[in-house]
Amino acid sequence: MKKLKINYLFIGILALLLAVALWPSIPWFGKADNRIAAIQARGELRVSTIHTPLTYNEINGKPFGLDYELAKQFADYLGVKLKVTVRQNISQLFDDLDNGNADLLAAGLVYNSERVKNYQPGPTYYSVSQQLVYKVGQYRPRTLCNLTAEQLTVAPGHVVVNDLQTLKETKFPELSWKVDDKKGSAELMEDVIEGKLDYTIADSVAISLFQRVHPELAVALDITDEQPVTWFSPLDGDNTLSAALLDFFNEMNEDGTLARIEEKYLGHGDDFDYVDTRTFLRAVDAVLPQLKPLFEKYAEEIDWRLLAAIAYQESHWDAQATSPTGVRGMMMLTKNTAQSLGITDRTDAEQSISGGVRYLQDMMSKVPESVPENERIWFALAAYNMGYAHMLDARALTAKTKGNPDSWADVKQRLPLLSQKPYYSKLTYGYARGHEAYAYVENIRKYQISLVGYLQEKEKQATEAAMQLAQDYPAVSPTELGKEKFPFLSFLSQSSSNYLTHSPSLLFSRKGSEEKQN
């Protein structure tokens, strides 16, 4: 048999020609208009969003938020950096897609028939309803029939405009509204509570989070049923970005990452309590300033605001608090626990906070390493409340009922079962008030959300006041001091004592740049 002589040069040339011929059909690479190829060639995923407590926010200069976290993971999935552009309202977001300034919109946007005519939706990941809001103490409308443009204002590009138009044509011909081209939904809700506006419309999740900081905002009525939330990208013949998004969300769903992120941002519950929230925020103003140094001093592995939320749940920041079961002090420690921690006076606020932190750290150290880092605190808090042994039972019960014992979202749903005989009778450590542990952790999360948002709001107000002061009394050179056109500064320069100096860092704050590199 004649041996074949292989012409490697010919094979190489043939393979090169074949690759060139097939290159345009390769889904993620190739032609210039392939979106994934363009993103990877650029080395960054451009995402436009809006600034809300849920979608995108910052604490101490560090970005966070449901949509931000998902977008960051998607950028990592593609092997590129994330570039976030923050816009003022929804209309500006879609302008970014239209003008080619964004690859994706990740901003809690609702899927609807009008939007999908012009833009490509991605997978849906939670749902909301649109609700009419008003200020507590003002007139609550029970229907839209008589609302006028002087009363009702909505944000530009808001999905509810289509619903309002349909309602006007089919049910309420007298209905009218105004669109404010300069404000987003959060700013309009602020206008409502400040008495500048009677009503606006926002989605149910945004309202729930807003109420944690502004409990005087109330829901008048639902405008729509539940609507799915999704991301949007340009609509054209290129489906590579859509395919990558689908693969990404499927992978996140299968490995439980999506459920964990949603639990982190949406798992605080929607059972808003006006009186409780208002009472808490009043305590933030009246009591927290005296306790803040202690929380900051002893908070080590956790944020001091979370520690403050724990202490409020325990005692409402009352160092003398005592329960019928004998627990006492700011962190409501038992006598035995206090003795084991070397605490001599449970009613001493500093001793109690220090001891409570050490006890919580002990619980944290016992949580299995398999539990994700950002969920360990919730397991530890449940153990802090009902005992670590019962937390082990809750994890075991979760595994037996086909849940994930390392997922707080799964375990917390089983906590109430620990007080039901058909379940606790089969567990190692028996009966526990699991429903109380569930409520305990959920309340702490709500207080933390309220505290973080409220302090941010206070900081924003202080910054705005300082900026206004800077505008009213602009900086001048020392040689100008004393001249009549600056009488206020002249007064300051002539004061021999107790004079006021304004550091530029106090007068001016860095404005949030629209584009943030992450």
Curated annotation (Swiss-Prot):
Catalytic activity: Exolytic cleavage of the (1->4)-beta-glycosidic linkage between N-acetylmuramic acid (MurNAc) and N-acetylglucosamine (GlcNAc) residues in peptidoglycan, from either the reducing or the non-reducing ends of the peptidoglycan chains, with concomitant formation of a 1,6-anhydrobond in the MurNAc residue
Sections of the chain in a coiled coil: none
Cross-referenced PROSITE patterns: TRANSGLYCOSYLASE
Catalytic residue positions: E314
GO biological process: cell wall macromolecule catabolic process; cell wall organization; peptidoglycan catabolic process
One Pfam family this sequence matches: SBP_bac_3
Start and end residues of each stretch annotated as Non-LT domain: 22-269
Top enzyme class: lyase
Keywords, comma-separated and alphabetical: Cell outer membrane, Cell wall biogenesis/degradation, Lyase, Membrane, Signal
Domain of life: Bacteria
EC numbers on record: 4.2.2.n1
Region of interest (LT domain), residue spans: 270-518
Protein's UniProt keywords contain Membrane: yes
One cellular-component annotation, GO: cell outer membrane
Annotated signal peptide: 1-21
GO molecular function: peptidoglycan lytic transglycosylase activity
InterPro entries membership: Lysozyme-like_dom_sf, MltF, Solute-binding_3/MltF_N, Transglyc_AS, Transglycosylase_SLT_dom_1
Annotated membrane topology: Peripheral membrane protein
Localisation per UniProt entry: Cell outer membrane
Entry domain remark: The N-terminal domain does not have lytic activity and probably modulates enzymatic activity. The C-terminal domain is the catalytic active domain.
Similarity remark: In the N-terminal section; belongs to the bacterial solute-binding protein 3 family.
Function: Murein-degrading enzyme that degrades murein glycan strands and insoluble, high-molecular weight murein sacculi, with the concomitant formation of a 1,6-anhydromuramoyl product. Lytic transglycosylases (LTs) play an integral role in the metabolism of the peptidoglycan (PG) sacculus. Their lytic action creates space within the PG sacculus to allow for its expansion as well as for the insertion of various structures such as secretion systems and flagella.
Protein name: Membrane-bound lytic murein transglycosylase F
Species name: Shigella boydii serotype 18 (strain CDC 3083-94 / BS512)
Gene: mltF
